[in-house]
Amino acid sequence: MKLLRGYLALIVTCLGMLLSDLVQRFLVGPWLWLRPQSRISVLGSWLQYLAWLVTRPFEVIGGASLPHPDRIIPCEPGVLVVMNHQSMLDLPLGVKTLTSGYLRVVTRRRYTRFIPLISHLSRLYQYPWVDPSANTGDARRMLKQLRKISRETDVPILIYPEGTR
């Protein structure tokens, strides 16, 4: 029965994410285009909703006991969040630690295309990306770009230092 509840929670989460992809593309994105001054608050609220969407079904339907972290990370320039990447729940739990606003997550290049919700999310939030298979010259350019982004961004940057699994 517990296994069935886990699968049901996963199905509910996936359906919610697919519906959220449509909302994100057709409501959130255009809203930001019309009201760019509300970017941090709108994207922060949207990301908090997505974190809730991913974690809540596992608690309610699946019976999982997930941590509820304190909101301690300020949304301001110059904040670097370093986390160990253990599961797909790391990002939603990291988002729940923000006092306001949203995180810019350093992500792999392959996640920026053709993945429902995730690819559009990475463009909407302007996530910096890296390509682990890049040659030395490209890797140096990516590091320079990351340095520039980290100095200019208004929100915290999240990085998983161990890279890929």
Task: Give the ranges of each region predicted by the language model.
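Membrane-anchoring hydrophobic helices of lipid-metabolizing enzymes
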Residues: 1-79, 92-93
